[in-house]
Amino acid sequence: MSIKENITQIIRELPSDVKLVAVSKFHPVESIMEAYGAGQRVFAESRPQELAAKVPAMESWLAANGMQNDIVWHFIGHLQTNKLKMVLPYASLVQSVDSLHLLEAIEKWGRDNGKVVAVLLEYHIASEESKQGFSEEEIKGILSDVGRFPHIRFR
């Protein structure tokens, strides 16, 4: 089954209030174009370099074909603070904020750039120490003091 056929079938079966997020990591821009042709509009990347390359490529392709840029990009996976400049100009949602250090760095980027960044906090439910994310207490602390993060929209 082609990408277009697969996405068309999935979208047809989804309730109207559910959005499909297509993870495009490791796929070439041509695959994103095919998915776009099937009606897919929300894409996610987990590698900053890929996001920073694919967004302008898709913007150019849409413009060259006289189409409106209605793609929404998410960032998934672990994000390092030194990669924020590659991700935040493009991602409408960062799905993987896993530390206070990263949250504070995103707040600073938003303040410096006059932007509000939408984020999801990663909740650490595993007992494994190697896993990342916030504890329940940390999340409660952050959410009780959201005024500290005026450039972040918690979703």
What are these regions (language model features)?
Residues M1-R155:
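Conserved alpha/beta-domain cores
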